[in-house]
């Protein structure tokens, strides 16, 4: 989640070479840590929650800093897989890097470029990562095999009808699920001060049959190994939900974020034999330092 924080001329980083080196070392480490700490899908939070306030920020802070970098630690309470009734705690890192209003790297948005930019909109492309699914994550997945991690490409757009931000994104996996997924969401600030902000908003997700079969389907071989009945889902809306994101700067640089999300599985995703809970909850806490 991106935040603007208290005003300060020191927010503009004057040592881009140092920042580039730091970013490079961080990304090297990033490739070595568990996949679920990376920019990912299926994401436990709505995508807008990773970038809440970015588009609105340009209305109140002009010019934007050349570099905006924050890094910290995070922990998340989330289902073991989409549709699970079991929960676990997943640690990770919180990394957000932005260059003006041009390029970015964040945990939920991935590595991207804003190709079109205006006072009330932005649109671009990004490269993310589908972490896949490991059958050892839950006894409810035994016999289904693993879904391999794979990169995915994304096209996104945001538009502001102040104070509401509308967002849509379409992504395509390459390996793993090889499917198309689209998200549409909206969010707005409901509370705020110089050091404290709260955003809330709904999200709906549509997935094609390839994605649905990979994550919610049961083919004949999987049916034999797992004991589940065969199930061939089609395309359609897979979920709808609501999220909230809050940030508190207790100093000029240190801040805490709290994110919560409720997701309701729909259609064939809800009817899948591996779906044990239609309602999915996620809580995420992080502490980070903004340079």
Regions found by a protein language model. Give the residues of each.
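Residues on the lipid-exposed face of transmembrane beta-strands in outer-membrane beta-barrel proteins
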Residues: 73-77, 93-99, 111-115, 155-159, ...
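Cleavable N-terminal export/targeting peptides
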Residues: 1-64
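Transmembrane beta-strands of outer-membrane beta-barrel pores
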Residues: 75-81, 99-101, 127-133, 161-163, ...
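Outer-membrane beta-barrel domain signature
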Residues: 60, 80-84, 112, 140-146, ...
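Short glycine/proline- and aromatic-enriched beta-strand/turn motifs that initiate or cap beta-hairpins
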Residues: 38-103
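Repeated loop/turn-to-beta-strand initiation elements of outer-membrane beta-barrel proteins
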Residues: 69, 101-105, 121, 163-167, ...
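Residues that define the transmembrane beta-barrel architecture of outer-membrane proteins
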Residues: 67, 87-93, 119, 147-153, ...
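Outer-membrane beta-barrel transmembrane domain signature
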Residues: 41-44, 49, 53, 174-175, ...
């Amino acid at each position: 989640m991106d935040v603007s924080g208290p005003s300060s001329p020191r927010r503009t980083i004057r040592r881009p070479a140092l920042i580039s080196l730091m970013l490079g070392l961080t990304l090297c480490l990033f490739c070595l840590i568990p996949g679920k700490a990376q920019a990912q899908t299926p994401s436990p939070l709505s995508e807008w929650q990773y970038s809440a306030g970015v588009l609105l920020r340009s209305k109140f802070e002009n010019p934007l800093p050349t570099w905006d970098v924050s890094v910290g630690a995070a922990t998340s309470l989330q289902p073991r897989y989409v549709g699970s009734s079991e929960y676990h705690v997943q640690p990770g890192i919180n990394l957000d890097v932005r260059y003006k209003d041009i390029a970015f790297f964040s945990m939920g948005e991935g590595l991207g470029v804003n190709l079109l930019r205006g006072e009330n909109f932005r649109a671009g492309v990004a490269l993310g990562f589908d972490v896949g699914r490991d059958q050892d994550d839950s006894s409810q997945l035994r016999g289904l095999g693993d879904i391999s991690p794979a990169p995915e490409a994304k096209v996104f757009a945001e538009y502001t009808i102040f104070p509401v931000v509308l967002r849509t994104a379409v992504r395509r996996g390459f390996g793993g699920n090889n499917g198309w997924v689209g998200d549409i969401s909206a969010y707005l600030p409901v509370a705020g001060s110089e050091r404290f902000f709260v955003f809330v908003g709904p999200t709906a997700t549509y997935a094609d049959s390839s994605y649905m079969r990979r994550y919610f389907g049961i083919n004949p071989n999987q049916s034999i190994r797992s004991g589940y009945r065969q199930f061939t889902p089609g395309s359609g809306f897979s979920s709808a939900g609501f999220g909230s994101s809050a940030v508190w700067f207790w100093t000029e640089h240190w801040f805490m974020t709290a994110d919560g999300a409720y997701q309701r599985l729909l259609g064939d995703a809800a009817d899948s034999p591996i779906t044990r809970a239609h309602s999915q909850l996620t809580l995420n806490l992080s502490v980070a330092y903004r340079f």
